[in-house]
Protein backbone atom coordinates (compact mmCIF):
# COMPACT_ATOMS: atom_id res chain seq x y z
CA UNK A 1 0.00 0.00 0.00
CA UNK A 2 1.35 3.42 -0.94
CA UNK A 3 2.24 5.53 2.07
CA UNK A 4 0.75 9.02 1.73
CA UNK A 5 1.20 11.69 4.37
CA UNK A 6 -2.28 13.20 4.66
CA UNK A 7 -2.01 14.83 8.10
CA UNK A 8 -1.54 18.29 6.61
CA UNK A 9 -3.87 17.87 3.62
CA UNK A 10 -6.35 20.76 3.53
CA UNK A 11 -9.70 20.93 1.71
CA UNK A 12 -11.65 24.02 0.74
CA UNK A 13 -15.44 24.26 0.74
CA UNK A 14 -15.29 24.12 -3.06
CA UNK A 15 -13.38 20.84 -2.91
CA UNK A 16 -15.85 19.34 -0.44
CA UNK A 17 -18.59 20.18 -2.93
CA UNK A 18 -16.61 18.95 -5.95
CA UNK A 19 -15.92 15.53 -4.42
CA UNK A 20 -19.20 15.16 -2.50
CA UNK A 21 -20.18 11.98 -4.40
CA UNK A 22 -16.87 10.41 -3.37
CA UNK A 23 -17.10 11.52 0.24
CA UNK A 24 -20.37 9.67 0.84
CA UNK A 25 -18.91 6.37 -0.41
CA UNK A 26 -17.86 4.24 2.59
CA UNK A 27 -14.88 2.96 0.60
CA UNK A 28 -13.53 6.49 0.00
CA UNK A 29 -14.79 9.16 2.43
CA UNK A 30 -12.49 12.03 3.38
CA UNK A 31 -9.49 9.81 4.14
CA UNK A 32 -9.58 8.26 0.68
CA UNK A 33 -10.06 11.61 -1.02
CA UNK A 34 -7.06 12.96 0.87
CA UNK A 35 -5.00 10.04 -0.44
CA UNK A 36 -6.10 10.85 -3.98
CA UNK A 37 -5.02 14.46 -3.50
CA UNK A 38 -1.56 13.39 -2.33
CA UNK A 39 -1.06 10.90 -5.19
CA UNK A 40 1.21 11.57 -8.16
CA UNK A 41 0.42 9.80 -11.44
CA UNK A 42 2.46 9.91 -14.66
CA UNK A 43 0.96 9.16 -18.08
CA UNK A 44 3.27 7.78 -20.74
CA UNK A 45 1.50 9.13 -23.81
CA UNK A 46 -1.46 11.47 -24.23
CA UNK A 47 -3.14 9.54 -27.04
CA UNK A 48 -6.04 7.10 -27.15
CA UNK A 49 -5.31 5.36 -23.85
CA UNK A 50 -4.06 8.45 -22.06
CA UNK A 51 -6.98 10.71 -23.00
CA UNK A 52 -9.73 9.11 -20.87
CA UNK A 53 -7.39 8.31 -17.99
CA UNK A 54 -6.01 11.83 -17.81
CA UNK A 55 -9.40 13.50 -17.69
CA UNK A 56 -11.00 11.00 -15.29
CA UNK A 57 -8.12 11.06 -12.81
CA UNK A 58 -8.10 14.85 -12.88
CA UNK A 59 -11.84 14.81 -12.17
CA UNK A 60 -11.38 12.21 -9.41
CA UNK A 61 -9.01 14.51 -7.53
CA UNK A 62 -5.55 13.09 -8.20
CA UNK A 63 -3.36 15.88 -6.86
CA UNK A 64 -0.47 15.74 -9.32
CA UNK A 65 -0.52 14.51 -12.92
CA UNK A 66 2.48 14.28 -15.23
CA UNK A 67 2.23 13.70 -18.98
CA UNK A 68 5.06 12.79 -21.33
CA UNK A 69 4.49 12.94 -25.10
CA UNK A 70 6.27 14.69 -27.96
CA UNK A 71 3.44 14.35 -30.48
CA UNK A 72 1.36 16.99 -32.25
CA UNK A 73 -2.43 16.65 -32.60
CA UNK A 74 -3.51 15.39 -36.02
CA UNK A 75 -6.96 15.09 -37.59
CA UNK A 76 -6.69 11.28 -37.56
CA UNK A 77 -6.32 11.37 -33.75
CA UNK A 78 -9.80 12.75 -33.17
CA UNK A 79 -11.53 9.43 -33.87
CA UNK A 80 -10.32 8.05 -30.52
CA UNK A 81 -8.34 10.70 -28.60
CA UNK A 82 -11.23 12.43 -26.87
CA UNK A 83 -9.19 15.13 -25.14
CA UNK A 84 -8.82 17.04 -28.39
CA UNK A 85 -11.00 19.06 -30.77
CA UNK A 86 -10.65 20.30 -34.34
CA UNK A 87 -9.23 23.64 -33.25
CA UNK A 88 -6.47 21.79 -31.34
CA UNK A 89 -4.98 20.31 -34.53
CA UNK A 90 -1.34 21.27 -34.96
CA UNK A 91 -0.74 21.94 -31.27
CA UNK A 92 1.25 19.92 -28.74
CA UNK A 93 -0.75 17.12 -27.13
CA UNK A 94 0.72 17.69 -23.68
CA UNK A 95 0.03 21.43 -23.73
CA UNK A 96 -3.59 20.96 -24.79
CA UNK A 97 -4.01 18.13 -22.26
CA UNK A 98 -2.71 20.40 -19.50
CA UNK A 99 -5.19 23.12 -20.47
CA UNK A 100 -8.08 20.63 -20.45
CA UNK A 101 -7.10 19.35 -17.00
CA UNK A 102 -6.88 22.83 -15.50
CA UNK A 103 -10.19 23.83 -17.10
CA UNK A 104 -11.77 20.86 -15.35
CA UNK A 105 -9.88 20.93 -12.05
CA UNK A 106 -7.71 23.99 -11.31
CA UNK A 107 -6.45 22.42 -8.07
CA UNK A 108 -4.59 19.68 -9.97
CA UNK A 109 -0.83 20.18 -10.33
CA UNK A 110 0.06 19.38 -13.96
CA UNK A 111 3.59 18.88 -15.26
CA UNK A 112 4.21 18.18 -18.94
CA UNK A 113 7.27 16.74 -20.63
CA UNK A 114 7.29 17.55 -24.34
CA UNK A 115 9.62 14.70 -25.22
CA UNK A 116 9.77 10.94 -25.68
CA UNK A 117 10.60 8.65 -22.80
CA UNK A 118 14.22 7.62 -23.29
CA UNK A 119 17.02 5.82 -21.53
CA UNK A 120 18.52 9.24 -20.73
CA UNK A 121 15.42 10.81 -19.11
CA UNK A 122 13.38 7.89 -17.76
CA UNK A 123 14.92 7.77 -14.29
CA UNK A 124 14.66 11.52 -13.67
CA UNK A 125 11.04 11.74 -14.83
CA UNK A 126 9.59 8.55 -13.39
CA UNK A 127 11.18 8.91 -9.94
CA UNK A 128 8.86 11.90 -9.30
CA UNK A 129 5.64 9.82 -9.44
CA UNK A 130 3.93 7.03 -7.49
CA UNK A 131 2.07 5.30 -10.32
CA UNK A 132 2.97 5.13 -14.01
CA UNK A 133 0.19 4.57 -16.56
CA UNK A 134 1.42 3.15 -19.85
CA UNK A 135 -0.31 4.52 -22.93
CA UNK A 136 2.55 3.76 -25.31
CA UNK A 137 2.18 1.72 -28.49
CA UNK A 138 5.68 0.35 -29.07
CA UNK A 139 7.87 -2.29 -27.47
CA UNK A 140 10.93 -0.07 -26.94
CA UNK A 141 8.98 2.24 -24.63
CA UNK A 142 7.24 -0.63 -22.84
CA UNK A 143 10.49 -2.41 -22.01
CA UNK A 144 12.20 0.81 -20.95
CA UNK A 145 9.20 1.64 -18.76
CA UNK A 146 9.25 -1.86 -17.27
CA UNK A 147 12.93 -1.64 -16.40
CA UNK A 148 12.75 1.88 -14.99
CA UNK A 149 9.75 1.02 -12.81
CA UNK A 150 11.59 -2.07 -11.60
CA UNK A 151 14.70 -0.05 -10.80
CA UNK A 152 12.74 2.65 -8.93
CA UNK A 153 10.09 0.33 -7.43
CA UNK A 154 7.24 2.14 -9.17
CA UNK A 155 3.83 0.70 -9.99
CA UNK A 156 3.30 0.19 -13.73
CA UNK A 157 -0.27 0.06 -15.09
CA UNK A 158 -0.20 -1.51 -18.55
CA UNK A 159 -2.75 -1.08 -21.31
CA UNK A 160 -2.75 -2.11 -24.95
CA UNK A 161 -5.26 -2.05 -27.79
CA UNK A 162 -5.47 -3.65 -31.22
CA UNK A 163 -8.42 -3.37 -33.60
CA UNK A 164 -11.31 -4.61 -31.41
CA UNK A 165 -9.39 -6.00 -28.43
CA UNK A 166 -7.70 -4.54 -25.37
CA UNK A 167 -5.59 -5.65 -22.40
CA UNK A 168 -4.99 -4.23 -18.92
CA UNK A 169 -2.71 -5.33 -16.08
CA UNK A 170 -0.80 -3.93 -13.11
CA UNK A 171 2.91 -4.72 -13.08
CA UNK A 172 5.59 -4.44 -10.38
CA UNK A 173 2.97 -4.25 -7.64
CA UNK A 174 4.06 -5.56 -4.23
CA UNK A 175 6.54 -8.01 -5.72
CA UNK A 176 4.17 -9.20 -8.45
CA UNK A 177 4.97 -9.92 -12.11
CA UNK A 178 6.45 -7.31 -14.44
CA UNK A 179 5.88 -6.67 -18.14
CA UNK A 180 8.81 -8.89 -19.13
CA UNK A 181 7.09 -11.80 -17.37
CA UNK A 182 4.11 -11.33 -19.67
CA UNK A 183 5.93 -10.53 -22.89
CA UNK A 184 9.59 -11.35 -22.48
CA UNK A 185 10.75 -11.22 -26.09
CA UNK A 186 12.19 -7.99 -27.42
CA UNK A 187 10.61 -6.05 -30.23
CA UNK A 188 10.38 -7.91 -33.52
CA UNK A 189 9.65 -6.44 -36.89
CA UNK A 190 6.49 -8.43 -37.46
CA UNK A 191 4.80 -7.40 -34.20
CA UNK A 192 6.09 -3.84 -34.20
CA UNK A 193 4.36 -2.95 -37.44
CA UNK A 194 0.89 -3.71 -36.02
CA UNK A 195 -0.16 -0.51 -34.22
CA UNK A 196 -3.25 1.69 -34.37
CA UNK A 197 -1.67 3.77 -37.12
CA UNK A 198 -1.52 0.92 -39.63
CA UNK A 199 -3.83 -1.84 -38.37
CA UNK A 200 -6.71 0.29 -37.12
CA UNK A 201 -8.63 0.37 -33.87
CA UNK A 202 -12.26 0.84 -32.90
CA UNK A 203 -12.47 4.42 -31.65
CA UNK A 204 -14.40 3.46 -28.52
CA UNK A 205 -11.90 0.80 -27.42
CA UNK A 206 -9.15 3.03 -25.96
CA UNK A 207 -11.84 4.79 -23.93
CA UNK A 208 -12.74 1.51 -22.26
CA UNK A 209 -9.17 0.31 -21.72
CA UNK A 210 -7.86 3.71 -20.64
CA UNK A 211 -10.67 4.06 -18.12
CA UNK A 212 -9.90 0.60 -16.73
CA UNK A 213 -6.27 1.68 -16.27
CA UNK A 214 -7.41 4.81 -14.43
CA UNK A 215 -9.71 2.71 -12.24
CA UNK A 216 -6.79 0.50 -11.20
CA UNK A 217 -4.81 3.63 -10.30
CA UNK A 218 -7.61 4.89 -8.03
CA UNK A 219 -7.95 1.47 -6.37
CA UNK A 220 -4.22 1.33 -5.70
CA UNK A 221 -4.17 4.83 -4.20
CA UNK A 222 -7.13 3.97 -1.97
CA UNK A 223 -5.44 0.78 -0.81
CA UNK A 224 -7.87 -1.79 -2.21
CA UNK A 225 -6.59 -5.37 -2.20
CA UNK A 226 -8.23 -6.58 -5.42
CA UNK A 227 -5.75 -5.27 -8.00
CA UNK A 228 -4.98 -6.65 -11.48
CA UNK A 229 -1.53 -7.77 -10.40
CA UNK A 230 -0.51 -11.19 -11.71
CA UNK A 231 -3.49 -11.10 -14.06
CA UNK A 232 -4.13 -9.85 -17.58
CA UNK A 233 -7.68 -8.61 -18.16
CA UNK A 234 -8.69 -8.83 -21.81
CA UNK A 235 -11.69 -7.22 -23.48
CA UNK A 236 -13.20 -8.12 -26.85
CA UNK A 237 -15.55 -5.40 -28.06
CA UNK A 238 -17.06 -7.58 -30.80
CA UNK A 239 -18.26 -10.20 -28.33
CA UNK A 240 -18.62 -7.83 -25.34
CA UNK A 241 -16.58 -10.30 -23.31
CA UNK A 242 -13.97 -9.96 -20.58
CA UNK A 243 -11.48 -12.68 -19.67
CA UNK A 244 -8.72 -12.97 -17.08
CA UNK A 245 -5.45 -14.87 -17.45
CA UNK A 246 -2.77 -15.49 -14.86
CA UNK A 247 0.81 -14.31 -15.40
CA UNK A 248 3.69 -16.38 -14.10
CA UNK A 249 6.10 -14.34 -11.96
CA UNK A 250 9.60 -15.22 -13.22
CA UNK A 251 11.27 -12.93 -10.66
CA UNK A 252 12.91 -11.01 -13.50
CA UNK A 253 15.60 -8.71 -12.14
CA UNK A 254 18.04 -6.18 -13.52
CA UNK A 255 21.29 -6.50 -11.62
CA UNK A 256 22.43 -2.94 -12.26
CA UNK A 257 21.44 -0.01 -14.45
CA UNK A 258 24.48 -0.53 -16.66
CA UNK A 259 22.97 -3.85 -17.77
CA UNK A 260 19.78 -2.26 -19.14
CA UNK A 261 21.07 -1.74 -22.66
CA UNK A 262 21.57 -5.43 -23.30
CA UNK A 263 17.80 -5.90 -22.97
CA UNK A 264 16.93 -3.39 -25.70
CA UNK A 265 17.10 -4.97 -29.12
CA UNK A 266 18.53 -8.24 -27.83
CA UNK A 267 16.82 -11.52 -27.20
CA UNK A 268 15.92 -12.30 -23.60
CA UNK A 269 14.88 -15.64 -22.22
CA UNK A 270 11.32 -16.83 -22.74
CA UNK A 271 9.20 -19.78 -21.66
CA UNK A 272 7.50 -20.00 -25.05
CA UNK A 273 9.44 -21.02 -28.14
CA UNK A 274 8.69 -18.84 -31.15
CA UNK A 275 8.98 -18.85 -34.91
CA UNK A 276 8.63 -16.11 -37.52
CA UNK A 277 6.14 -16.48 -40.35
CA UNK A 278 9.01 -16.82 -42.82
CA UNK A 279 10.50 -19.67 -40.79
CA UNK A 280 7.07 -21.26 -40.49
CA UNK A 281 6.53 -21.10 -44.25
CA UNK A 282 9.84 -22.87 -44.85
CA UNK A 283 8.90 -25.56 -42.33
CA UNK A 284 5.49 -26.12 -43.92
CA UNK A 285 6.93 -26.33 -47.42
CA UNK A 286 9.32 -29.04 -46.21
CA UNK A 287 6.20 -31.26 -45.84
CA UNK A 288 7.18 -32.47 -42.38
CA UNK A 289 4.15 -34.52 -41.28
CA UNK A 290 4.78 -34.16 -37.53
CA UNK A 291 3.09 -30.80 -37.00
CA UNK A 292 -0.29 -29.15 -36.59
CA UNK A 293 -1.37 -25.52 -37.04
CA UNK A 294 -3.59 -24.24 -34.21
CA UNK A 295 -5.66 -21.08 -34.70
CA UNK A 296 -6.83 -19.75 -31.30
CA UNK A 297 -9.11 -16.99 -32.61
CA UNK A 298 -12.88 -17.31 -32.32
CA UNK A 299 -14.95 -19.28 -34.84
CA UNK A 300 -16.18 -16.17 -36.68
CA UNK A 301 -12.64 -14.90 -37.27
CA UNK A 302 -11.47 -18.36 -38.30
CA UNK A 303 -14.20 -18.80 -40.91
CA UNK A 304 -13.42 -15.41 -42.46
CA UNK A 305 -9.77 -16.34 -43.08
CA UNK A 306 -7.21 -18.79 -41.75
CA UNK A 307 -4.09 -20.69 -42.73
CA UNK A 308 -4.94 -23.74 -44.83
CA UNK A 309 -5.08 -27.01 -42.84
CA UNK A 310 -5.17 -25.22 -39.47
CA UNK A 311 -7.24 -26.44 -36.52
CA UNK A 312 -9.50 -23.93 -34.74
CA UNK A 313 -9.24 -24.09 -30.92
CA UNK A 314 -10.71 -20.77 -29.67
CA UNK A 315 -8.88 -19.32 -26.67
CA UNK A 316 -12.05 -18.83 -24.65
CA UNK A 317 -12.78 -22.58 -24.89
CA UNK A 318 -9.29 -23.99 -24.79
CA UNK A 319 -9.13 -24.56 -21.02
CA UNK A 320 -12.16 -26.82 -20.98
CA UNK A 321 -11.17 -28.97 -23.95
CA UNK A 322 -10.20 -32.61 -23.98
CA UNK A 323 -7.24 -32.95 -26.34
CA UNK A 324 -7.02 -36.74 -26.39
CA UNK A 325 -9.08 -37.11 -29.58
CA UNK A 326 -6.95 -34.59 -31.51
CA UNK A 327 -3.65 -36.44 -31.09
CA UNK A 328 -1.42 -33.46 -30.31
CA UNK A 329 1.06 -35.27 -28.08
CA UNK A 330 3.56 -36.34 -30.75
CA UNK A 331 3.34 -33.25 -32.93
CA UNK A 332 4.87 -29.79 -33.08
CA UNK A 333 1.96 -27.43 -32.45
CA UNK A 334 2.29 -24.05 -34.16
CA UNK A 335 -0.05 -21.63 -32.36
CA UNK A 336 -1.24 -18.36 -33.90
CA UNK A 337 -3.93 -15.68 -33.52
CA UNK A 338 -4.48 -12.32 -35.24
CA UNK A 339 -1.32 -10.80 -33.79
CA UNK A 340 0.23 -11.96 -30.51
CA UNK A 341 -1.87 -11.58 -27.37
CA UNK A 342 -4.15 -14.62 -27.57
CA UNK A 343 -1.41 -16.90 -28.88
CA UNK A 344 0.75 -15.97 -25.87
CA UNK A 345 -1.98 -16.97 -23.41
CA UNK A 346 -2.85 -20.13 -25.35
CA UNK A 347 0.79 -21.20 -25.73
CA UNK A 348 1.51 -20.89 -22.01
CA UNK A 349 -1.60 -22.88 -21.15
CA UNK A 350 -0.89 -25.62 -23.71
CA UNK A 351 2.74 -25.89 -22.59
CA UNK A 352 1.40 -26.59 -19.10
CA UNK A 353 -0.50 -29.51 -20.69
CA UNK A 354 2.89 -30.98 -21.74
CA UNK A 355 2.37 -30.21 -25.43
CA UNK A 356 5.17 -29.28 -27.85
CA UNK A 357 4.22 -25.66 -28.55
CA UNK A 358 5.82 -23.09 -30.86
CA UNK A 359 4.16 -19.67 -31.08
CA UNK A 360 3.94 -17.85 -34.43
CA UNK A 361 5.13 -14.27 -33.90
CA UNK A 362 2.86 -11.64 -35.39
CA UNK A 363 0.14 -14.18 -36.14
CA UNK A 364 -2.12 -14.10 -39.16
CA UNK A 365 -1.54 -10.38 -39.69
CA UNK A 366 2.20 -10.92 -40.08
CA UNK A 367 1.55 -13.81 -42.49
CA UNK A 368 -0.72 -11.63 -44.64
CA UNK A 369 1.74 -8.72 -44.60
CA UNK A 370 4.89 -10.73 -45.29
CA UNK A 371 3.83 -13.96 -47.06
CA UNK A 372 0.47 -12.99 -48.49
CA UNK A 373 -1.35 -16.11 -49.67
CA UNK A 374 -3.00 -18.10 -46.87
CA UNK A 375 -2.80 -21.28 -48.95
CA UNK A 376 0.84 -22.14 -48.36
CA UNK A 377 0.45 -25.41 -50.32
CA UNK A 378 0.43 -23.56 -53.64
Swiss-Prot record:
InterPro entries in the cross-refs: Rhodanese-like_dom (IPR001763), Rhodanese-like_dom_sf (IPR036873), ThiF/MoeB/HesA (IPR045886), ThiF_NAD_FAD-bd (IPR000594), Ubiquitin-activating_enz (IPR035985)
Main enzyme class: transferase
Location of this chain's protein in the cell: Plastid, Chloroplast
PROSITE patterns according to UniProt: RHODANESE_3
Pathway: Cofactor biosynthesis; molybdopterin biosynthesis
Keywords, sorted A to Z: ATP-binding, Chloroplast, Molybdenum cofactor biosynthesis, Nucleotide-binding, Nucleotidyltransferase, Plastid, Transferase
The keyword Nucleotidyltransferase belongs to this UniProt entry's keyword annotation: yes
UniProt domain Rhodanese: residue ranges: 287-376
GO BP term, pick one: Mo-molybdopterin cofactor biosynthetic process
Gene Ontology terms, MF aspect: ATP binding; molybdopterin-synthase adenylyltransferase activity; sulfotransferase activity; thiosulfate-cyanide sulfurtransferase activity; ubiquitin-like modifier activating enzyme activity
Functional note: Catalyzes the adenylation by ATP of the carboxyl group of the C-terminal glycine of sulfur carrier protein moaD.
UniProt similarity note: Belongs to the HesA/MoeB/ThiF family.
PANTHER family: ADENYLYLTRANSFERASE AND SULFURTRANSFERASE MOCS3, UBIQUITIN-ACTIVATING ENZYME E1
Entry protein name: Probable molybdopterin-synthase adenylyltransferase
Originating species: Pyropia yezoensis
Amino acid sequence: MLNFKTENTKYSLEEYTRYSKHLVLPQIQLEGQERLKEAKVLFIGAGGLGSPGIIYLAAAGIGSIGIIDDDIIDLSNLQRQILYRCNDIGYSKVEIAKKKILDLNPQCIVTVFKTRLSYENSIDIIRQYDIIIDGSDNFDTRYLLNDTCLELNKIHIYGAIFQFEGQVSVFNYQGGPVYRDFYSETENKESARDTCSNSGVLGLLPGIVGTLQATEAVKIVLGYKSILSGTILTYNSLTSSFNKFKIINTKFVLSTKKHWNKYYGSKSSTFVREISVIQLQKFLISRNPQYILIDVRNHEEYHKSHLIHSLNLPLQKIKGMNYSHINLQDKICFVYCSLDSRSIFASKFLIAQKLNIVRVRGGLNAWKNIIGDLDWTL
